[in-house]
A protein has these predicted regions:
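A conserved regulatory-domain signal marking ACT and ACT-like small-molecule sensing domains
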Residues: 1-80
Length: 80
């Protein structure tokens, strides 16, 4: 099963690398990525697939929300 995360964050040096690194370390594969940026804020959309059934996208969203630059994380189902 795939999930989609939409992450709103403050555009800062290294922010995208930190978020993607956390996603991969927590056992998810990035299947798609899109980003939009305006001045000092940005939005990152990640299509994810867990590497095993034990991985929870809800826990991942909480962990991403703890990063300094992250303002909001929304979970949505992967479109069919």
């Amino acid at each position: 099963m795939r999930d989609r995360l939409v992450i709103d964050f403050a555009a800062a040096e290294g922010a995208v690398v930190r978020m993607i690194g956390l996603v991969e370390r927590r056992g998810f594969r990035v299947c798609g990525i899109a980003m939009a940026e305006e001045e000092e804020k940005a939005s990152l959309t990640l299509d994810l697939q867990p590497l095993d059934a034990k991985r929870s996208v809800d826990v991942l969203a909480l962990q991403l929300g703890r990063l300094h630059e992250v303002r909001n994380v929304a979970i949505s189902g992967f479109p069919s």
